[in-house]
Each structure stands twice: as structure tokens, then as C-alpha cells.
Amino acid sequence: MKTFTAKPETVKRDWYVVDATGKTLGRLATELARRLRGKHKAEYTPHVDTGDYIIVLNADKVAVTGNKRTDKVYYHHTGHIGGIKQATFEEMIARRPERVIEIAVKGMLPKGPLGRAMFRKLKVYAGNEHNHAAQQPQVLDI
């Protein structure tokens, strides 16, 4: 008996749409990362991208527990000396709500070329509209 290995050209990828309204950020991100990797499929292979495409709507309405709305801080560096910048969860939601979900999911994916390919299949939108109707995404309840 041989071990099954998925081939990149034979992987069937579906499109799913998820509504993030009222969902807890971390719990949503873990399920998104799992589906982007393809771990929910029987033909999952660690070194092959077997995941699905996922569209996340209403990213501006994602929830966090406790005091994280004001206490959770995101850091990034501009590349210049003394260029460390910070923003709270509240500021991030006000400025770029998509980035909050993207950062959470990206940290849960593998680092390297395979992880970047998986991350490209995540489409996040702040509002209720998306431009992927041609792909006929199925509603995914998380």
C-alpha cells in the first residue's frame, strides 16, 4: 500500500464566503487558517497547497473578548531608525479593518513560499460586498 500524495494540478479548490459579524477574532482565524491549508480535506498533504479560497465579509464587525478592543496593540516598523509604530485594535478597525483578520490568519499559516501561496487565497472585505460572484462561493458557517 502506498502513501497518497496530492498533486498540485489535481487539487479541487472551492470558494467559500464567511460573515465575520460578531465572530471572535482568534476562533475565526484558526478555522480560516485550517481551511486555507486544506487540513479539512482527506487528501491533505503538508507540502502541497490543498486549501480552498475564502472570502471574509464584514471584517469591521469582528469581535474580541475582554479588554482587547483597547488593550491589544499591533506593532510594525517602517525600516528607519526609531521607526517603530503601534496601533490599538480599535485604531486598526477604524483605519484598515481587513488587516486585523489578515494579520491573525497570516500568523497561523506556515512561513515561506507555501504559506504565502495559501495566504493569497484569503480575500477580506470590510463591508458586505465582494467582487467574486463569478466564482459562485458557497456560504460557510463558522
Curated annotation (Swiss-Prot):
It comes from the Bacteria. GO terms for biological process: cytoplasmic translation; negative regulation of translation. GO terms for cellular component: cytoplasm; cytosol; cytosolic large ribosomal subunit; ribosome. InterPro entries: Ribosomal_uL13 (IPR005822), Ribosomal_uL13_bac-type (IPR005823), Ribosomal_uL13_CS (IPR023563), Ribosomal_uL13_sf (IPR036899). Keywords: Ribonucleoprotein, Ribosomal protein. One of its GO terms (molecular function) is mRNA binding. The keyword Ribonucleoprotein applies. Belongs to the universal ribosomal protein uL13 family. Part of the 50S ribosomal subunit. This protein is one of the early assembly proteins of the 50S ribosomal subunit, although it is not seen to bind rRNA by itself. It is important during the early stages of 50S assembly. This is Large ribosomal subunit protein uL13. It comes from Escherichia coli (strain K12).
